Amino acid sequence: MASKEVTYYQVPDRYWHRIHFVRPRFKSNIENVLLYMANECCRIPKCSCEEYNSRYFNAIKMFPGNIDMADKTLHNWRTEIPALFGFYKEDKDLDITETSKMAVFLHENQDLTQFLRLFLFSFQFPGGHMKPQDLKDIIYHGIRFKPARTIIQVLMSGNRFLGEMGSEKEMSISAEEATYCIFNDVRVTSGKVTADQIAQTILDNRKKKIKYYNPKDSKSMSLTGKARSKGDMTRYAGDILDYMEIANLLEEHNGYYSMKGNELSSLNTFANDVTWFSGYESFYKKKDIETMELSKVEPLWFEYVNNSMKPELFKTDIRSIIGQSDEIDVVFEDRIKDVVTSDDRTSKDIGNLGEAIICGHE
C-alpha cells in the first residue's frame, strides 16, 4: 500500500529568519536558580567590576549541585543570567557593577510569576540581550517583535474564530506551530501579518493536516550541513511558551498551550501593549551598521528593562492558584485579608491558611 504523501508548511526563503536568543543551561531548574541568584546578587554591594564578578561567580558555584561543575559551565551561567535577565548593571568606564532593580524586585517579592510576566512584557527583538551581529541581522530584516504579546493576540484571535464556528474548543498553539507560523517568518516578526491571519493559518493547517518540521528542508540544516532535530528547530519558541506557562499566562496540555481562563486581565494587558524600546530605531535607516554602535545601546536597553519592573502592572492573584472564580474564592480571599491585616495573627493561622490553599490547589 502506497504511503500517503506528507504536505509541509513552507515559508518562502526570502521571509525565513530564525529567531534565537540566550538559552540558559539551567532552564530545567529556572525557578530555583533565578530566586537563588536574585537573593545572592542582593548580598553583593556596589563595587568594582572585578570584585562583583568574583563574588557573583562564587555564588553560582555554591548553588546546590554546582560545586563540582566545570568552570566553563559556571562561566556560561555567569554570562547567561545577566544577558537574559539583567541581574546586574556593569559600567566598565567607571569600573562599577551594581545589582539591578530586576534582581532586587525578585529578591524582595519572591514572586517568580510576577517577575516573569514583567520580563516577558518588555522582552523584544531587537533587544540588548542579543549579540551585536545578531542584532544587525534582526534590523536588516526589519524585525520588530514582542513574542509574548504576539502569541496572546494569536490565541485570542483563534478563540474568536472557533467561537464563530460554534466550536467549544479553546485555541491552542504548539512550539512547532509558533516556530514556523510566528517566530521564523519575517512577515510576522516585522508586523506585516496580523494575529487574525496567523490564527487562521494555524487552524487551516490543522484542518489540512499540514506538517511543519521537515529534516530534508534546507531550512532545517545546521552550519555543519546536518539536519537539526525538531527540538533544535523549535526550542526558542518553546522557551517563550514555557516561560509564559511559569508566568501563569498559559497552560500546557500534550504539547499545546492555551490561555489561562482566570488570567484575563493580565492577558489583556499583554494583548493591548504598545510599549517599545526604541533605542535601535535609528539603525533601521542605515545600510551599514557598526557592531560597536549597537553595543553602545546595550546599557540603555537594560536601563529600560529595569525601569519596566512596575509591581502594580501585574499582581499574582491567589485565585489563579486555587482555580476558577467561584463561591469558595470569596471565602479564601476574605480569610487571606483577615490573616494578612490582623495584628494578632499567629504562625498557626498562617500555617492553616497555607494548608487550605494547598488543598484547594490539589
Where in the sequence are the language-model features?
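Donor-sugar nucleotide-binding helix/loop cap in glycosyltransferases
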Residues: 2-325
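A short, surface-exposed helix-loop junction/capping segment
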Residues: 58-59, 215-224, 330-348
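Acidic-basic catalytic patches of nuclease active cores, encompassing PD-(D/E)XK
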Residues: 341-362
